[in-house]
């Protein structure tokens, strides 16, 4: 066990420091904004330091372990630890949350509560990625929903209450299955209940019961990922939310579902996963085509980007279903890659709306001339989204594609049909992406508006965009920097789990 509680400090610091926001002197929103920025940067630096000096990337075992007994009655522990699967999402969470806080500077209404909720969300996400107790996993899963619901319902568009209600109904409904599965696994087959993921990973179940557990967990994670047909909350939520909230939703929240699918469904229920993996491949391929086709018909800019996120999650599902080292590595890399790309696109969509006050694509046009910097940045991130070689999107899709081709589990016909469907999705992506850019930036429609003078992006927007672009380019040119964090853990998951 680690003697210094690094992870506990990292999890608790944002919410503890955030609670002090309400005691800051009333000297305007600037003090609150810079205080939140400093806390976010401090948290990111602390996380980076702990991982650089106390984490061994070539060790697949759980590291920085902390285990404190919380409720003795049913063996509930505050049990934390990280490995190759969790270090990437944790660092992504710190990076995106810091940038989303910087993006939230225009927020002036109830600024104290807004920034407090962002820090609470920060703690919940870090806690979920670092917990090693199944019941604690559920508590973090639920705890993180509260600030998201309040951020959606209080800041956003005219239909924000509708979208927030839809979000909480979907996610709370999925959480019921997560709780039932956690209690079922924790209480099964032993005199003393345990929720320790280390013990549960070595436990075996009857085939029928394991399938039931798998389906329950899958429904919970499918809502958050999201997987069709449980995705309909996402476009409405993104369409109404403030863009800093959208950055957190697209960059981190969706990845929680993918993380749970690997951490619980693959690690704990490996036999059932091998049985259901062909269906995952089919669902992933259908999702790529369906979401890309639906995105093309969206008038709302943010809803079009939201459907593109759903489409890209299809590649992640296929990587998880391939049951190969390469495919799972590609899926984990897609978690990081899309976290950056999705956050960047929603940020630029939000800054564009702040300037022109238009959200429907058929009302836009000609923005490239008055706002060339935003045009350039949006074009670059659109290229990253459609998997331009040299950027992270291309690498992740290629690795997932290669992982499917080399999988020994599937017949030749499946290795032909699924990549064929994936290729159609890859063709559809530039169609809706370039169509979006054409409607926004070309033509003369915007000059007919009463106020045809618009400010281009300032230093804050440029800094944010460059900060997100550099990791996208870095992963695209040298993906092994990220893959090296998880490659040993992926090998252990597949060798230990599927050879039992």
From Swiss-Prot:
It comes from the Eukaryota. One of its GO terms (molecular function) is ubiquinone binding. Its main location: plastid. One of its GO terms (biological process) is electron transport coupled proton transport. One of its GO terms (cellular component) is chloroplast thylakoid membrane. The keyword Kinase does not apply. This is NAD(P)H-quinone oxidoreductase chain 4, chloroplastic. It is an enzyme of class 7 (translocase). Belongs to the complex I subunit 4 family. It is found in: Plastid, Chloroplast thylakoid membrane. NCBIfam families: NDH_I_M. The chain crosses the membrane at residues 4-24, 31-51, 84-104, 111-131, 134-154, 167-187, 212-232, 242-262, 272-292, 308-328, 330-350, 386-406, 411-431, 462-482. It holds the Pfam family Proton_antipo_M. Keywords: Chloroplast, Membrane, NAD, NADP, Plastid, Plastoquinone, Quinone, Thylakoid, Translocase, Transmembrane, Transmembrane helix. It is a multi-pass membrane protein. Its EC number is 7.1.1.-.
């Amino acid at each position: 066990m680690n003697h210094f509680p690094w992870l506990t400090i990292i999890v608790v610091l944002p919410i503890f420091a955030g609670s002090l926001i309400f005691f800051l002197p009333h000297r305007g929103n600037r003090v609150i904004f810079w205080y939140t920025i400093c806390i976010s940067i401090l948290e990111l630096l602390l996380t980076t330091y702990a991982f650089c000096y106390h984490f061994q990337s070539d060790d697949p075992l759980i590291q920085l372990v902390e285990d404190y007994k919380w409720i003795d009655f049913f063996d509930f522990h505050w049990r934390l630890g990280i490995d190759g699967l969790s270090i990437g999402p944790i660092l992504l969470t710190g990076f995106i949350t810091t940038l989303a806080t910087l993006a939230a500077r225009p927020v002036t209404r109830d600024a104290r509560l807004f920034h407090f909720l962002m820090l609470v969300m920060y703690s919940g996400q870090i806690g979920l990625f670092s917990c090693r107790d199944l019941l604690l996993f559920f508590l973090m899963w639920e705890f993180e929903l509260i600030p998201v619901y309040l951020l959606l319902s209080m800041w956003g568009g005219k239909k924000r209450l509708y979208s927030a209600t839809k979000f909480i109904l979907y996610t709370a409904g999925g959480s019921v299955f997560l709780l039932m599965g956690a209690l079922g696994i924790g209480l099964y087959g032993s005199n003393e209940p345990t929720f320790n993921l280390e013990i549960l990973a070595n436990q075996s179940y009857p085939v029928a019961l394991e399938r039931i557990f798998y389906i329950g967990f899958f429904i919970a994670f499918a809502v958050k990922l999201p997987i069709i047909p449980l995705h309909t909350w996402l476009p409405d939520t993104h369409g109404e939310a403030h863009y800093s909230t959208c950055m957190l939703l697209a960059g981190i929240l969706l990845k929680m579902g993918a993380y749970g699918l690997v951490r619980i469904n693959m690690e704990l229920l490996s036999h059932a996963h091998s049985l259901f993996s062909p269906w995952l491949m089919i669902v992933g391929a259908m999702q790529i085509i369906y979401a890309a086709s639906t995105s093309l018909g969206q008038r709302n800019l943010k809803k079009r980007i939201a459907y593109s996120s759903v489409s890209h999650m299809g590649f992640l599902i296929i990587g998880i279903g391939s049951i190969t080292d390469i495919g799972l590595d590609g899926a984990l890399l897609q978690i990081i890659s899309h976290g950056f790309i999705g956050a960047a696109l929603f940020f630029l969509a939000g800054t564009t709306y702040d300037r022109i006050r238009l959200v429907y694509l058929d009302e836009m046009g000609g923005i490239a001339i008055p706002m060339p910097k935003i045009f350039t940045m949006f074009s670059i991130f659109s290229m990253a989204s459609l998997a331009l070689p040299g950027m992270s999107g291309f690498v992740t899709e290629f690795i997932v594609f290669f992982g499917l081709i080399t999988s020994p589990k599937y017949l030749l016909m499946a290795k032909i049909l699924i990549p064929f469907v994936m290729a159609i999705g890859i063709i559809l992506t530039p169609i809706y992406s370039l169509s979006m850019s054409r409607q926004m930036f070309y033509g003369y429609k915007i000059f007919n508006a009463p106020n045809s003078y618009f400010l281009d992006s300032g230093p804050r927007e440029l800094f944010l965009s460059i900060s997100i672009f550099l990791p996208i380019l870095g992963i695209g040119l040298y993906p092994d920097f990220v893959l090296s964090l998880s490659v040993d853990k992926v090998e252990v998951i597949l060798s230990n789990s599927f050879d039992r």
